[in-house]
Amino acid sequence: IMTKEQFASIPLREETIEENSQQAVFNAVEMGRLDLASGKHRDAQKKNKIKDQAANTGTTKKQNIPYFEDMNFDSVIADEGHNYRNSFSAGREAGQLAYLPNPAVSKMARDMAVKAAYMMKRNNGRGVVMLTATPLVNSPIDAFNMLSTVIPQEEWMRMGIITPDDFVRVFGKTATVQVQKISGEVEEKQG
């Protein structure tokens, strides 16, 4: 039993972080979002951005404690699971929807996401449980983030989902809405 701060301070091995970022690139290629063979500068930039985002565990490890992988956890049960709901930010599409909050990525949530992915890969899609009494009323991005800690990436890919934008596209229902700007002008937007 440990606090969320103690859990976040447990370091991950560089190999695990690299494997996580390579998996993110592979997922993007599989979904047709990235062409590694094109040789285009834009695709190389996109690949690097995907790798960097996936490799960022969000926390700096300062203590001299064993690596997460060496602790041989077979399960992680996190109370107050809603504390880990900002592990991914909305992409270009979902970020433009009216009334959809797009909070900054939480370092602690990002760390949990990488550790949860490691646990599920090691335990055949199992091993992570999130407990919360906080309802998912904020946004579909919150739902995606929380579900991503307990659903393996392979399962998401079967549904055609690798990003929060995909989740909104598959499960969200949008319509044209009127939004009033600060200037008083009204514009139509997807929301």
Locate the predicted segments by residue.
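Inter-Walker segment of RecA-like/P-loop motor cores
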Residues: 1-11
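Residues immediately flanking
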Residues: 4, 80, 133
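SF2 helicase catalytic motif II
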Residues: 7, 16-118
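Activation segment
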Residues: 10-11, 85, 139
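Conserved P-loop NTPase motor "coupling/switch" region that bridges the ATPase
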Residues: 28, 75, 91-191
